[in-house]
Amino acid sequence: MANWRKYIPEGTKDILFQECKKKVQVENILREIYINSGFLEVKSPTLEFYDVFNIENSTLPQEKIYKLIDGQGRILALRADMTTPIARIVGTKLRDAVYPLRLCYTSNVYRVNESLNGKNSEITQSGVEVIGIKDINADAEVIIMGIKSLLNCGLENFKIEIGHAEMFKALVEDANLDYEEKEKLRESIDTKNFTALNEILHENKGKFEKSSLNVLKELPKLFGGIEIIEKASCLTCNKRAIKALEDVRKVYEIVESIGLGEYLSVDLGMVYHIDYYTGIIFRGYTQGFGGNILSGGRYDNLIAQFGENKPATGFAIDVDGIIKSLETNGNFSDKNDEKVLVYYNKQNFKEAYERAQSLREKGIVAEITHFDEEKEAREYAHSKNMKFLKI
């Protein structure tokens, strides 16, 4: 039997020294912008009951969730995302809170991934949730918060793509498609797989109104600037679809009005987690990171599954993705702290400690060495790029 004592599971990693410092730095930047914007920080247990995530229209299939059994035979789960536990907290512990609620978090989440696919099983997410307000301005505020968060971390070359969950729903609402057919159609549009899309629409063309069929064919192509909304409006008379387009336009214009339009684009073919999201949806991409570095949207039906019917919108940022992108693009501001090694003889520990403490109070990293020989201490200081102070 193999002994795995010296190894860690696939999809996890040890975070050491400078990398750990960078991660804390990014987390603190994000936390500061949230708190300064009136958000209150929450943390949920790493272990939840599996039932918390086994809900209608979950964003994660059950095979992506790590499960274990407690001493009473109940199924537990490692926290698979943060939004669902926050919905549980709101629905059970914050019923009498003053709304709207502005909550923020930074926590690790855990997801099962296929072996050797390069994805992490342990992910650090940081994000916000605005709960109890169903207004397009709240959607815009959350997107602005996402843009400001990425900018404050030092990212420059990124885009936030905006879409709407109702667009796809409106176009397929009258089609007699079963769940599997609808899911294949959704996936082909979201991944912009035109071959699969044309095949699905051809096989089911008798189930769609002609106008809806034409829009669905064009949906993956409808991405770009705000002009895409006008183009899409000319393709459909569906009232739900037109309302969705107006929502996207309003959000875009609000964000643009405060000078952040350069970070926006429209993607009406964005149709991920379509049963979970209920309104504006968005994803952020940046150079140096393969996946989406930020994702979010409006989810007005989730909290009701935990006892309180509250509308909500929010986003999650991939903290490790930010670090990777900053490193790839050479944008990471990693100032070297001044470091001093304090060497003393055995009779002078008190003086050495007081001198080191004085340096620390000035923001200087001060380490007391316990080497007997001064030569060894100097070599140690040189190897760690530290100044040498002899007491």
Swiss-Prot record:
UniProt cross-references to InterPro entries, sorted A to Z: aa-tRNA-synth_II/BPL/LPL, HisRS-like_core, HisRS/HisZ, HisZ
Subcellular localization, as worded in the UniProt entry: Cytoplasm
Primary location class: cytoplasm
GO BP, one annotated term: L-histidine biosynthetic process
Keyword presence, Metal-binding: no
Keywords of this entry: Amino-acid biosynthesis, Cytoplasm, Histidine biosynthesis
Pathway: Amino-acid biosynthesis; L-histidine biosynthesis; L-histidine from 5-phospho-alpha-D-ribose 1-diphosphate: step 1/9
GO (cellular component) term, any one: cytoplasm
GO molecular function: catalytic activity, acting on a protein; histidine-tRNA ligase activity; transferase activity
Note: This function is generally fulfilled by the C-terminal part of HisG, which is missing in some bacteria such as this one.
Protein function: Required for the first step of histidine biosynthesis. May allow the feedback regulation of ATP phosphoribosyltransferase activity by histidine.
Subunit structure: Heteromultimer composed of HisG and HisZ subunits.
HAMAP family registered for this protein in UniProt: HisZ
NCBIfam families documented for this protein: hisZ_biosyn_reg, PRK12292.1-3
Protein name, per record: ATP phosphoribosyltransferase regulatory subunit
